[in-house]
């Protein structure tokens, strides 16, 4: 849901890379009128990506939520109520008061939550109706707040996701000259406002070394 997002090809690429662990037969792309022209481009690209990978995955694009959510195993949410114009307003709210303009916390995050939560709960009501056993994978920001709303006010199984910890792990692995899978980073906090508490590599905490390397690179 929110298929016109530029992040969709990255998600599809992840599905292709993990097709042996997570075999799928169909992907249903969903968007609204405002994002339809972008979603049509994503539809064509998604089909070509699966074809190039040799995977027989059916891909459709729809605005019909019942069609999209009936008998599915996973629902991925990555929409933005109000589109990019709303993001501009959210970030300028904070800037107006001398704070960082951000869409996941602070004034901007709170404003975005006011729009994202009602829309997400509306989607969850349809998930409960048409696919009660499905998992909601929530990328919609502010991810932590939206996910908490789903947990508190619906019966939908949900996981809140953010790519910041993953990007942090990638950067740390480069500093350590290590494989990403061998680096464990313990993080705490809400999405886009997180702290690395420990970096474990080869059985040792490498936090001090990593911090020194990052500080040296930024001097």
Where are these regions (language model features)?
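Gly/Ser/Thr-rich loops at beta-strand to alpha-helix junctions
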Residues: 4-8, 34-36, 83, 138-146, ...
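Rossmann-fold NAD(P)-binding glycine/threonine-rich loop
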Residues: 47, 81-153
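Short acidic low-complexity segments
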Residues: 58-71
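Substrate/ligand-engaging "lid" and interaction regions
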Residues: 156-157, 161-219
